[in-house]
Amino acid sequence: MRERNEMILADLITIRAEQRPDFDILTFDRSGVGDGTLADEVRTYGALAENANRIAAALIARGLGRGERFGLMMRNHPEFVESMVAASMAACVLVPIDPRTRGEKLAYTLRNAGCRGIVCGDYCLEQIDAVRASLPDLAWILALDSGEAHEAAALIGRAGVDSLGAVLSWPVPTVDVRLESPEDPLQIIYTSGTTGDPKGVVAPNSRFGLFALLGAVFGYRPDERPYTGLSLTHGNAQAVTLGPSLHMGLRVVFSRRFTKSRLWDICRKHGCTTFSMLGGMATAIYSEPARENDADNPVRMVVSAGMPAAIWESFERRFGVSVFEWYGAIEGGLAFKPIGEGPIGSFGKPVPGLQMRIVDEQGEECPPGVIGEIVSRPATGEEATVEYFRDAEASRKKTAGGWLRSGDMGHRDVEGWLFFDYRKGGAIRHNGDFINTSFVEKVIAEHPGVADVYVYGVAAASGAPGEKDVVAAIVSVPGAAFSPASVFAACHEGLEPNFVPTYLQILEEIPKTASEKPQERFLLERFQAGGSGIFTEKSS
């Protein structure tokens, strides 16, 4: 009989449910959801374990074997966490998918991962239905009635769509944890695909176990009450908020999504003492109209990845908080700047046990102040490892020379403090997401009024370090009526929100090289010059 191991998610929850069955570990705030009358949802360790057993039994009943994959596509609901624990119990592999994903990106993710089924929110059913015909291996759908998508909820129980709620009403089964090792995979988290198709990072149970231990890195206290509105499909919400809370017994609060206007009210309502944010979120929060009670909140610490140096100290003063800055990626690499230490704008130094360097194109370490790629490996000198699902070549390139190649460009100062500057190759990072321009170009190119399109990035108006706004350079069909508003509408229909261009740049032609490669520098020069050809959603 295998000994239980808290590095395995299923074991952790089973043990905590035995120790503290009535402890209310999860709260899902539903302020502003639906008609505003929905009560918050709470899960104790005991209820979390019971529902995870029910979902695990449902996965096994649907024929999912060890290591087989299913999609998990929903906003922040308790059922998301329960499905994660269920995957660990059943030794299946979950594939978290942003619920805004649609079209070819959604189809590619499900197809590449070989998902046999999908657990989703009812508001995702239309997106899934639009691509289901191209996914012959997708045998089943378990849908959650969210209480906010009334028309979509009516689809549950029809056309191969089963009710997750019905599963959760079953008598509680006892599912023996089928995992054999913490190194068995728990999930495949797909990258944004900035340089091609998205790649699936295979994350073992032990990786989530390491997330659970990050509470010590972030300095969480025993009475901490964390909050996040970031999607649980994203590594940040799992690493900064969920993992440490489950492990340490912190009464954590989630909301369905991040809303800057309700952030502080949610923290006041639940007594939250810390929250997490990415990229341009800091500027969005700071841009809200000032209130007399801005600093009247229970938050002591904001765990940030990408706080703009320009507003860092003003943000702390206005809201009465301290900023804990950190850096990391799902593939690996972790650094942090303790509160009150190091220069403003730095993301810190690597955690103990990890080496992090700034290197040039030849792999030589850059001197202080010189920008190079951020790379990392174990401090023991062992080679870094990463596994991209079904992509051995990409896995090899990611760890060429034994170092994890982040693709991020940065520099260090003379005291070894590290700074992020931009994404290698000029890829677009917008509101924390790396944008695959090919998806954006495809949607715009299919618009009947568009003859040519090229998508690139410009420095974000938010000022967030490394962030860019999305520009779509467009040539319209000669003689055809052209409406920028209709292009924006098509983008909203075919893309997730972060992929929708910030600007449309209308041109007579897109400058290109002899090999038909668009010349971005000329487009950028024209954009910076302004003029009548630049449109935003408001101006269109």
Per-segment meaning from a language model:
Residues 49-54, 182, 187, 201-222, ...:
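Conserved structural elements of the adenylate-forming
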Residues 247, 269-277, 286-344, 355, ...:
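Gly/Ser/Thr-rich phosphate-binding loop
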Residues 101, 118-120, 356, 376-382, ...:
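AMP-binding/adenylate-forming catalytic core of the ANL superfamily
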Residues 5, 22-77, 81-85, 102-107, ...:
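Conserved AMP-binding/adenylate-forming core of the ANL superfamily
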Residues 11, 61-62, 85, 89-166, ...:
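Structural core segment of the AMP-binding/adenylate-forming
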Residues 6, 21-24, 143, 159-162, ...:
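Conserved pre-ATP/AMP-binding loop-to-beta segment of ANL
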Residues 209-225, 233-273, 288:
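Conserved AMP-binding/adenylation subdomain of ANL enzymes
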Residues 144, 496-517, 536-540:
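AMP-binding/adenylate-forming catalytic domain of the ANL superfamily
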